[in-house]
Curated annotation (Swiss-Prot):
This is Holliday junction branch migration complex subunit RuvA. The lineage of its organism: Bacteria, Pseudomonadati, Thermodesulfobacteriota, Desulfuromonadia, Geobacterales. SMART domains: HhH1 (SM00278). The RuvA-RuvB-RuvC complex processes Holliday junction (HJ) DNA during genetic recombination and DNA repair, while the RuvA-RuvB complex plays an important role in the rescue of blocked DNA replication forks via replication fork reversal (RFR). RuvA specifically binds to HJ cruciform DNA, conferring on it an open structure. The RuvB hexamer acts as an ATP-dependent pump, pulling dsDNA into and through the RuvAB complex. HJ branch migration allows RuvC to scan DNA until it finds its consensus sequence, where it cleaves and resolves the cruciform DNA. InterPro entries: DNA_helicase_Holl-junc_RuvA_I (IPR013849), Hlx-hairpin-Hlx_DNA-bd_motif (IPR003583), NA-bd_OB-fold (IPR012340), RuvA (IPR000085), RuvA_2-like (IPR010994), RuvA_C (IPR011114), RuvA_C_sf (IPR036267). It comes from Geobacter sulfurreducens (strain ATCC 51573 / DSM 12127 / PCA).
Length: 199
């Protein structure tokens, strides 16, 4: 099983990348959080890998940290959650915030994640609560709010999206139409903006 890949970043998109390892290109599916941390194409990248094997295919899922990979593996152990849904979940919420919601039994927060209904949220709490408590990612009872102001976050997100090739006027229009919470992180707003731009 492939557990780690290090090579040249040949291509990147918000949901998958191609890593060139000694002339062999590996397609690796990724969450938005990993995409946000990627270097420029042509640079060296190293990702922790989960290899998902089915009867007719092998898929690779890559993560910037081992903790994120471990949380992904926890998610796919839950009945009804496959690897693509687990990746999408991690694209919409940070592991620390997800851990907090599971440990606290916050069904409202869990159900607000795209693709997760009430029954799936209940299964997440039932099947993962004790496992999450034992993980390093397990949160304290209350997460510290972000200190970034919405305007600063919007500027950071705009800069990141322009660097990805989006036109600044389009980016600014999307951000202006979005509702940015006072404690929203740059990464969360970036994920939200990318979803709008990719429609």
């Amino acid at each position: 099983m492939i557990a780690l890949l290090t090579g040249r970043l040949a291509h990147k998109s918000p949901d998958a990348i191609i890593i060139d390892v000694n002339g062999v290109g590996y397609r690796v599916q990724i969450p938005f959080s990993t995409y946000y941390e990627l270097p420029e194409e042509g640079k060296t990248v190293s990702l922790s890998i989960h290899t998902h094997v089915k009867e007719d295919s092998i898929s690779l899922f890559g993560f910037r940290t081992l903790a994120e990979k471990e949380f992904f593996q926890l998610l796919i152990s839950v009945s009804g959650i496959g690897p693509k849904m687990a990746r999408d979940i991690l694209s919409n919420i940070q592991p620390e915030e997800l851990a907090a919601a599971i440990v606290q039994g916050n069904l409202v927060r869990l159900s607000s994640i795209p693709g997760i209904g009430k029954k799936t949220a209940e299964r997440l709490v039932l099947e993962l609560k004790e496992k999450v408590r034992k993980m390093d990612v397990a949160p304290s009872a209350q997460e510290a709010p972000s200190s970034e102001a919405p305007a600063e976050v919007a500027d950071d997100v705009a800069s990141a999206l322009v660097n990805l090739g989006y036109k600044e006027a389009v980016v600014r229009k999307v951000l202006a139409e979005m509702s940015i919470e006072p404690d929203a992180s740059t990464e969360a707003v970036l994920r939200q903006a990318l979803k709008v731009l990719m429609k």
